[in-house]
Amino acid sequence: MKATELRNFSIEELRKKEKELRRELFNLRFQLAKGELQNVKRMKAVKKDIARILTIITEKTMMSSKGEAHKN
């Protein structure tokens, strides 16, 4: 998923998506351990998506905290 698409989501939606991706990564790790995983590249992609989501959540919280500081 691209960062531009993720920036349109709210923080709650991003956290929900992060939770889904972490669950998927957990399942992929089990498949890898059992030798069932066919597409190892998917694990790398999921990790990067999680990192993107966490970065955007941080950006949004920083922007909202800056906005509140200017109002006071």
UniProtKB/Swiss-Prot annotation:
Biological process per Gene Ontology, one example term: translation
MF GO annotations: structural constituent of ribosome
One Gene Ontology term, aspect cellular component: cytosolic large ribosomal subunit
Keyword Ribonucleoprotein: yes
UniProt feature coiled coil, ranges: none
Keyword annotations: Ribonucleoprotein, Ribosomal protein
PANTHER family given in the database record: 60S RIBOSOMAL PROTEIN L35/50S RIBOSOMAL PROTEIN L29, LARGE RIBOSOMAL SUBUNIT PROTEIN UL29C
Similarity field: Belongs to the universal ribosomal protein uL29 family.
HAMAP family reported for this sequence: Ribosomal_uL29
Name this polypeptide is given: Large ribosomal subunit protein uL29
